[in-house]
């Protein structure tokens, strides 16, 4: 009906325009007054000229309304929806800062020596409208083919419960949150992540788990690093069983290079510890080809030789298999993907790492712990944060920062929804389907089935595996070809009994099949040996046994969501985090089955839509950055840093410069840089900054020249984390190049570069991009993220590849000499790449350039508004800041006893998430607005900070107590305000409603200030019985 209406209007419009051509009194096409076909809202301009039409369409004379070509263009353009400041507001804000217009401000801020004249896309330059973008993505989706996947290898199709899909994965209340640094406004996702950790510890049989890692392969590499650290680097060999996934083996080999570890791949029977040099071993349980082995004696032997055992496992299998902890494993890693997270052509998925309490401080990634708040009530927080890379720098346990919190929450809710019995039912069904298939093959007699027990994957020996795979292909099924005579078939939650019947026909090789899966199923016996059957209960906490109906889970998800502040509520001005709009149109394709349901190792001809998108995205990113080739494999910013440095390392190695291992890092560089350099085996030299926050060029020159023979790289963030554009950045790059090094640029602050300058133009050789910052992938409460790396032509041959599906640079270099494998999937977290792709395509080159300009404008506007209340620590040569700036609170500690944390907690009462605290400079706040925040929102945040400064002034004047005041008492949750007794020296009303806008809508914290010290001293990282929480709260009170 709607389409017919549009066609009718189009025909009428054409007829009316045609009629005007025959009327000499009309000089341009015109329309009559609004009719029932063309409303008064029609985008045409009245000319004021009266005309007489040959046909009086509506009974009275009308004015001529000339047609504007611009008005005929589609109205659903995207930049005006993303960039919040109107042109009028831009001018007024620039004038407030002290410039006549926005461009004058940008000219004064970005150094002329590195400015681009303009940027032009080779595709989508004018920007697609939102409806055009959806149509384009639908076209790409139609080019993907969804086959039934029986490949396995750590990736399985899964039934994503729609209540979780709609209310978490598609819900901005969950996916626009930041990492839960402000625990008082993050209790919801902290509880969900604690559920995840509890689920992992229960199933693995080990007491400690983190809140997610990037993927199973990198989790195994982290475990290998742990083994090296446990042995204090004294044992330099790590053995990997050949029954591990090939991508895991390659990732570990790549990572081992940086630690100078020797990786040996061997059959289990050939493991040799006689050298005394083995720090750890890695085994798979179940194996990559499906076999189930009892590792009890193997682990005892390893321990007897002082060797740590890492076990890669499968959470669904562990619902019915003896847990690795009971077998004696020291560390367990794996992926939670098959717990309700789509395959997504490789990710994102939540990996995990579990271990014993003994190694808790060596664990990578975020860990959620139980603590208490200032009232003594239980509260959750991120535990042991002093392990993290921005604090310990090159001494950190890992460079991991953004992980996979959103996907961990989905997996946790999958466990909550199904509960222990539901999960066991799924596992037994999958195992039953595999067993039925194996029994049927034995009955057919055309192939040979492995004798070893299995869980979900059946190994088959045949005459011609390729012929069988091709037959399966005809039925839209993908099998794994191991070698010319071996094939494996992996079953999952979505497999049906009819699929098994189809597989019988495939493997019958033309022979009649005289039975069905249903007919032989009653004869099939459990294939799991009695010694490996799980007996230990799991998921016994009430949370996993209460929410098994959709209504109950919906309410539980909503209850947790209500505790968390997200971009749905207010701006999140965290410096170097770029919390910008995650537009609905950008997010929509992520959950389309045509993108979500493809196995990462499916033949590429089944993913032509993805491949076309990869090519387009690679070309667009090259245009934006000035680079020649991109790798999309790194699935986090920290992974991108590591990958970029490893590319530089491979380049030096290929030239015979094995000795080049010195990395210079300014103190103004991004916090993960030193940890990433350490992972690559580099020797780190730190250089300082001057009083204006710029890199001390003379100090850098001396460092480069003193290490000329061994210089590998410089890691630099641009603009710097001090919030300034280095005027001498081109000179800095030249110094490094003149001394034989390469320039690695951290892309954390790319939001201040796009369209104005570029890493390649400035002189960088390699740069990673945080797609979850500049390019709109949401932060998800702590992940997912993406960190693709762009390189100049001379580095392109060394971009990472993959052992299962060959990959490399986009566009591909003339020659390839890949450094190894960085992530478990060939193209990283491919499922979220459509988000960045649609953002770039819809913005067009002008819109995305304006985004950078407005981000800079917003930061300068806020800095100007705040400068009379707080010192702005660093500014550029013309007195401006970049897209972020640092507010100096250090004097307030002396005058009022106020720390950055106090200001951040009071901001919660005003409805805001605090800025980045005490980094990169201790005692400061780093503020980054983005282009998608309105002037009204910026003003509210500034008003809040100014109001807090006035509250601090009352302390300075001695009008209120130094320790008992509204700032030290913040935040103020409802339960505190509603208590029978109120002993504070300020009113409840002032505590709760310090600003007038809060009367209309207020976000409430759900806990008082959380005690960080108590949580680390009394470390609890799993759900405890409810009565224990109550007893602990009473004891604390």
UniProtKB/Swiss-Prot annotation:
Its cofactor is pyridoxal 5'-phosphate. One of its GO terms (biological process) is glycine decarboxylation via glycine cleavage system. Keywords: Mitochondrion, Oxidoreductase, Pyridoxal phosphate, Transit peptide. Its EC number is 1.4.4.2. It is found in: Mitochondrion. The modification N6-(pyridoxal phosphate)lysine is found at residue 773. Pfam families: GcvP2_C, GDC-P. Gene3D superfamilies: Aspartate Aminotransferase, domain 1, Type I PLP-dependent aspartate aminotransferase-like (Major domain). Homodimer. The glycine cleavage system is composed of four proteins: P, T, L and H. Belongs to the GcvP family. This is Glycine dehydrogenase (decarboxylating) A, mitochondrial. It comes from Flaveria pringlei.
């Amino acid at each position: 009906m709607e389409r017919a209406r549009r066609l009718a209007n189009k025909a009428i419009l054409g007829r009316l325009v045609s009629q005007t051509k025959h009327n000499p009194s009309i000089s341009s096409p015109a329309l009559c007054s609004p009719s029932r076909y063309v409303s008064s809202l029609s985008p045409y301009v009245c000319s004021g000229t009266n005309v007489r039409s040959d046909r009086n369409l509506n009974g009275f004379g009308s004015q001529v309304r000339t047609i504007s070509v611009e008005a005929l263009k589609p109205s659903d353009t995207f930049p005006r929806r993303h960039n919040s400041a109107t042109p009028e507001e831009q001018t007024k804000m620039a004038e407030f800062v002290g410039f006549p217009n926005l461009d004058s401000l940008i000219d004064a801020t970005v150094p002329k020596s590195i400015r681009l004249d303009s940027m032009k896309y080779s595709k989508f330059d004018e920007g697609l409208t939102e409806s055009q973008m959806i149509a384009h993505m639908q076209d790409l989706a139609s080019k993907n083919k969804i086959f039934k996947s029986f490949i396995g290898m750590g990736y399985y199709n899964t039934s994503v419960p729609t209540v979780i899909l709609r209310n978490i994965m598609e819900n901005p209340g969950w996916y626009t949150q930041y990492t839960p640094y402000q625990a008082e406004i993050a209790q919801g996702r902290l509880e969900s992540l604690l559920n995840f950790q509890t689920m992992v510890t229960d199933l693995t049989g080990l007491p400690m788990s983190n809140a997610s890692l990037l993927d199973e392969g990198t989790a195994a590499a982290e475990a290998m690093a742990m083994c090296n650290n446990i042995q204090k680097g004294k044992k330099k060999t790590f053995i990997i069983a050949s029954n591990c996934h090939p991508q895991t083996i390659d990732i570990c080999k790549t990572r081992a290079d940086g630690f100078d570890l020797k990786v040996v791949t061997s059959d289990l029977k050939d493991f040799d510890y006689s050298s005394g040099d083995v720090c750890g071993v890695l085994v798979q349980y179940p194996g990559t080809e499906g076999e189930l082995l009892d590792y009890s004696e193997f682990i005892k032997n390893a321990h007897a030789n002082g060797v740590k055992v890492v076990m890669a496992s499968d959470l669904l299998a562990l619902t019915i298999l003896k847990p690795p902890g009971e077998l004696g494993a020291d560390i367990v890693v794996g992926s939670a993907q098959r717990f309700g997270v789509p395959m997504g052509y490789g990710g994102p998925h939540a990996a995990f790492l579990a271990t014993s309490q003994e190694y808790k401080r060596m664990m990578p990634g975020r860990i959620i712990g139980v603590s208490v708040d200032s009232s003594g009530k239980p509260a959750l927080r991120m535990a042991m944060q002093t392990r993290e890379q921005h604090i310990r720098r090159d001494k950190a346990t890992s460079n991991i920062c953004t992980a996979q919190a959103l996907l961990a929450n989905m997996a946790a809710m999958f466990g909550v929804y199904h509960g222990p019995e539901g999960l066991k039912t799924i596992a037994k069904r999958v195992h039953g389907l595999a067993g039925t298939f194996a029994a049927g093959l034995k009955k057919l007699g055309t192939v040979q089935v492995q004798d070893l027990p299995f869980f979900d994957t059946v190994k088959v020996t045949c005459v011609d595996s390729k012929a069988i795979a091709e037959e399966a292909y005809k039925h839209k099924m993908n099998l794994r070809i191991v070698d010319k005579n071996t094939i494996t078939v992996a079953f999952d939650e979505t497999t049906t009994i009819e699929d098994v019947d189809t597989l019988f026909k495939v493997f019958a090789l033309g022979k009649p099949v005289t039975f069905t899966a249903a007919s032989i199923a009653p004869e099939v016996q459990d294939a799991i040996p009695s010694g490996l059957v799980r007996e230990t209960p799991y998921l016994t906490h009430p949370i996993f046994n209460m929410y098994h109906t959709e209504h109950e889970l919906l309410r539980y998800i909503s209850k947790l969501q209500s505790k968390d502040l997200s971009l749905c509520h207010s701006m999140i001005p965290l410096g170097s985090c770029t919390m910008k709009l995650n537009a609905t149109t950008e997010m929509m394709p992520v959950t389309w089955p045509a993108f979500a349901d493809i196995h990462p190792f499916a033949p590429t001809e089944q993913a032509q839509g993805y491949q076309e998108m990869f090519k387009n995205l690679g070309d667009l990113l090259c245009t934006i950055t000035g680079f020649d080739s991109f790798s999309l494999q790194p699935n986090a910013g920290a992974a991108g840093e590591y990958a970029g440095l490893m590319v530089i390392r491979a380049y030096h190695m290929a030239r015979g410069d094995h000795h080049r291992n010195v990395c210079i890092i300014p103190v103004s560089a991004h916090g993960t840089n030193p940890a990433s350099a350490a992972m690559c085996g580099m020797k780190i030299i730190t250089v300082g900054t001057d009083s204006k926050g710029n890199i001390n060029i003379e100090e850098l020159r001396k460092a480069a020249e003193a290490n000329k023979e061994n210089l590998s790289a410089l890691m630099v963030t641009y603009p710097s984390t001090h919030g300034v554009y280095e005027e001498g950045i081109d000179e800095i790059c030249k110094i490094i190049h003149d001394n034989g090094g390469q320039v690695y640029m951290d892309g954390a602050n790319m939001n201040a570069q796009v369209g104005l300058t570029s890493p390649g133009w400035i002189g960088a050789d390699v740069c990673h991009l945080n797609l979850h910052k500049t390019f709109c992938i949401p932060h998800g409460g702590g992940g997912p993220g993406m960190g693709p790396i762009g390189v100049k032509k001379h580095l392109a041959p060394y971009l990472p590849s993959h052992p299962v599906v060959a990959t490399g640079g986009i566009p591909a270099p003339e020659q390839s000499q890949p450094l190894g494998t960085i992530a478990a999937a060939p193209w990283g977290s491919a499922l979220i790449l459509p988000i960045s792709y649609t953002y770039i395509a819809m913005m067009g080159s002008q819109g995305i350039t304006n985004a950078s300009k407005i981000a800079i404008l917003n930061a300068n506007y806020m800095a100007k508004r705040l400068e009379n209340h707080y010192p702005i620590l660093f500014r550029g040569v013309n007195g401006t800041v970049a897209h972020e700036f640092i507010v100096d609170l250090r004097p307030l500690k002396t005058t009022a006893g106020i720390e950055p944390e106090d200001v951040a907690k009071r901001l919660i009462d005003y409805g805001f998430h605090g800025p980045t605290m005490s980094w990169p400079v201790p005692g400061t706040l780093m503020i980054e607005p983005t282009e998608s925040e309105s002037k009204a929102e910026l003003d509210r945040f500034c008003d809040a900070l100014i109001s807090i400064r006035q509250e601090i002034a009352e302390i300075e004047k001695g009008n209120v107590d130094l320790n008992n005041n509204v700032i030290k008492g913040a935040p103020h949750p409802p339960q505190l305000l509603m208590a029978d007794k109120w002993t504070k020296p300020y009113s409840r009303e002032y505590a709760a409603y310090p600003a007038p806008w809060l009367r209309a809508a207020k976000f409430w914290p759900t806990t008082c200030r959380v005690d960080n010290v108590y949580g680390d001293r009394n470390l609890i990282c799993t759900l405890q019985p409810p009565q224990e929480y109550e007893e602990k709260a009473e004891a604390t009170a």
